[in-house]
Design a protein with these regions (language model features):
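Phosphopantetheine-dependent thiolation modules in NRPS/PKS and related acyl-activating systems
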Residues: 1-24
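Positively charged, low-complexity intrinsically disordered regions
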Residues: 15-16, 22, 29, 162, ...
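Structural signal for interior beta-strand "rungs" in well-ordered beta-sheet cores
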Residues: 152-154, 158-253, 389-390, 395-489, ...
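Terminal amphipathic alpha-helical/low-complexity segments used for targeting or macromolecular assembly
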Residues: 19-156, 242-393, 479-628, 716-735
Length: 735
């Protein structure tokens, strides 16, 4: 029964009452909008976090200015080295960043206990504010990545010896990791989520020698037993017994009693000096963008070399931003290529100690490419992407379309005509018992890997096959088969044989037209760099009134820059793509290319200057409305991933959790199909979930974490559903 309608019919046939309603009915009242007072509090938190971000970058700007003054840039101001040293220590070292985040969390969350609290109440906003502060100070940045175990302990978590932790700990400190546990990248350990008017928060426990797969989520109260394995992309709601393998959303015993690939029966020697190596490497990796951007920085600084008044150099500096942007992107791309290629030397399939040269190289590769797909976003989902992936070392066939894929290049093979959608994960490493396992992953010819889909080490997406949105490639599969969900189940699908010029066989002139549009993706990057120049000049101007004024008013500058970025992005959307309607468009069409151009403004301009920091805040809904979304009063929205905002309706009091995608388009056989998505009054879409086009979540209905609402499904009013794909959820289980 793969669809809600079929499930409902089956349930109705077994019971006299309408079981599709009764089995999952939720007696709680329809949630009200987030109160105005709470929204005002959030705006205050936004100002504090903006001031913190501004203070960090103010220190960088004044440090550069002081150095340049000593090198002969007479117009540059000088600042006390004592002030700069303290600022750099607090704002730009892992000890300072993590230490300050821990201090704020410990003070604000003192006395917090597991339980259910009001949405947007004191407890909820305290947790949300601490998370926003941690992001603002850089405690969760690349620089701090190797310090996550220390971060967890300082927050109050119980962490045993020999733990490998490649994810961010919860600011609540409600975490227990037994000795030898392994946490893979992008695991959600937050231990909280919003449902209707309730905020659930609880302790998360991972016993000794257990492992949690990438992109999994552990809900409040989740407990993973000793030696248990939770497969990638799973959602743990309760207890996973010791020694068992569980998979899926919600997680359940896996049919694969034995995980693919034998693991060593002993732990590797864990040389302590590798801890220092990883710590230093994290700092060095955070400087890769700066190293790549150095030639561009030199270009931007040239006009201010011989001026008497720094402000007089601003017009010439802004005029150089297009050239500097191109030079900077090329420089960073070259740095990424060199790092990734060097780190591929000696990497072979099999098991490697986490604390070893090969393990270190694999970790560097994935972290670097994760950073690259953010900073080099314009080259993804373009005609350049296959060439870029080949340069990185992946085996990529002809006619491949790839978006923001994260992969281990030396272990990846992508066949001719394959399609990899947004945020796909290919050949990522596995962790267990101090070991890191890597293996080859393959995406077959004309295969499709959907949004946030995963093809793990040793797996493949079959030729002419499909792995759907938020789904994992199976252990074994035959050509032409399609798979949905976690764990994956076979999906009936009728594939088209179309190979016309608008799908698989574009004419040369279509390639030229698309290339011309893709060149325009540099425009939002230029705008972002120009905005950075303006902010830097504003910081220098503020510093002339004294450091206290600069520190206090810097947040106003950052908020102003964010407002400009948001407005320019909205204007660009309406100029480029205008209002989007329910429709279909082939891949090789102007609509698809222009839609990607508009999205580049979102990711490269609005994202870093506004949207990343605004998620959950009332300001994010104001901006999304300006993009065309219909959003009611008091909506709690922790995502900006509404790809075609015109097609989204979020009614009063609805909640959209962190990491969610309100997916209003799908590519089926290289044809983009767009339709509406609606969340009714007080409806909930839990964290890390995806809702597909033409779907509706009814009034007061709740879809739990890590769930997939399929295309065209209508979740009944006042009911609870969860899973990938969704199924009825016991109304007594509010974990």
């Amino acid at each position: 029964h793969p669809r809600l309608g079929a499930q409902a019919a089956m349930l109705d046939s077994r019971h006299d009452a309408p079981a599709s309603q009764a089995a999952v009915s939720d007696p709680r009242p329809v949630p009200s909008p987030v109160p105005i007072g709470a929204q005002v509090t959030q705006l205050g938190i936004d100002v504090v976090c903006a001031t913190v971000r501004a203070a960090r970058w103010l220190v960088v700007v004044l440090t550069l200015a002081t150095v340049l003054h000593g090198l002969g840039w007479g117009a540059m101001p000088r600042t006390s080295w004592a002030f700069l040293a303290v600022g750099l220590l607090v704002g730009w070292t892992p000890v300072g960043q993590i230490g300050l985040s821990v201090l704020v969390s410990r003070v604000c969350l003192r006395g917090l206990r597991p339980g259910t609290y009001p949405r947007a109440g004191r407890v909820h906003l305290s947790v949300w504010g601490c998370e926003k502060f941690a992001e603002s100070i850089g405690a969760t940045s690349m620089m701090s990545a190797p310090w996550m175990l220390n971060y967890a302990r300082w927050l109050g978590a119980s962490v045993g010896r020999g733990v490998d932790m490649h994810a961010v700990p919860p600011v609540t400190g409600m975490l227990t990791l037994g000795g030898g546990a392994a946490i893979e990248p992008e695991v959600d350990l937050s231990g909280h989520w919003v449902e209707g008017e309730e905020f659930h928060v609880g302790h998360v426990r991972v016993a000794s020698h257990a492992s949690i797969g990438a992109r999994s989520i552990l809900l409040p109260g989740a407990s993973v037993g000793k030696g248990a394995v939770v497969s990638a992309g799973s959602a743990v709601h309760g207890l996973v017994p010791a020694g068992q393998v569980w998979a899926g959303s919600p997680a359940s015993p896996s049919s694969a009693r034995k995980v693919v690939g034998e693991w060593p029966d002993h732990r590797p020697v864990r040389a302590r000096w590798w801890v220092a190596v990883y710590a230093v490497t994290g700092i060095l990796l955070s400087f890769l963008p700066i190293i790549g951007f150095l030639p561009a920085l030199w270009l931007l600084l040239r006009p201010s070399r011989d001026v008497d008044v720094l402000g007089s150099a601003l017009p010439a500096t802004l005029a150089l931003t297009p050239l500097a942007t191109i030079v900077g992107m090329l420089g960073f791309a070259l740095v990424v290529l060199v790092v990734v290629r060097l780190c591929a030397i000696g990497v072979r399939e099999g098991h490697h100690a986490v604390r070893s040269r090969v393990g270190w190289q694999i970790w560097i590769t994935e972290r670097t490419l994760d950073m690259a797909r953010t900073l080099l976003f314009p080259i993804y989902a373009s005609q350049l992407t296959p060439w870029w992936l080949r340069l990185l070392g992946a085996d990529v066939g002809r006619g491949v379309e790839a978006s923001t894929v994260l992969l281990l290049p030396c272990m990846t093979k992508i066949g001719d005509g394959a399609f990899l959608a947004d945020d796909t994960l290919v050949a990522s490493y596995d962790l267990r018992g101090g070991w890191m396992r890597v293996g080859r992953a393959r995406v077959g010819k004309r295969a499709f890997l959907g949004n946030s889909g995963m093809a793990a080490a040793g797996r493949k997406v079959p030729k002419d096959g499909l792995v759907a949105v938020l789904s994992a490639a199976p252990h074994k599969s035959k050509s032409g088969t399609s798979w949905l969900g976690s764990p994956p189940v076979k999906l009936r699908r009728i594939a088209t044989e179309s190979v016309d010029e608008r799908t698989y066989s574009p004419t040369p002139i279509l390639r030229v037209y698309r290339g011309l549009v893709e060149v325009c993706r540099l425009v939002p990057v230029v705008c972002s760099v120009a905005l950075g120049v303006l902010v830097a000049y504003a910081f220098v101007a503020l510093a002339a009134f004294g450091l206290p004024a600069a520190l206090l008013l810097g947040g106003v500058v950052v908020l102003g820059a964010g407002a400009i970025a948001a407005v320019v992005t909205s204007l660009a959307k309406w100029l480029i793509i205008r209002r989007i309607a329910v429709s279909e468009h082939p891949l090789w069409s102007a609509f698809v290319w222009l839609n990607e151009l508009s999205d580049t403004f979102v990711e490269m301009l609005a994202g870093p200057w506004f949207a990343w920091a605004a998620t959950g805040s009332p300001t994010i809904t104001v901006w999304l409305r300006s993009l065309g979304a219909r959003i009611g009063r008091g909506v709690w929205c922790e995502t900006y991933w509404l790809p075609e905002a015109d097609l989204v309706r979020l009614a009063d009091g609805a909640s959209v959790g962190r990491g969610c995608v309100v997916q209003t388009h799908l590519f089926h056989d290289r044809v983009m199909s767009l339709d509406t998505v609606t969340l009714g009054v007080g409806a909930t879409l839990g964290p890390n979930s995806v809702v597909l086009p033409a779907a509706r979540i009814g009034t007061g209905a709740s879809v739990g974490p890590a769930s997939l609402v399929l295309r065209g499904e209508d979740v009944p009013d006042g009911t609870r559903w969860v899973g990938n794909p969704i199924a009825p959820w016991d109304s007594d289980d509010h974990a």
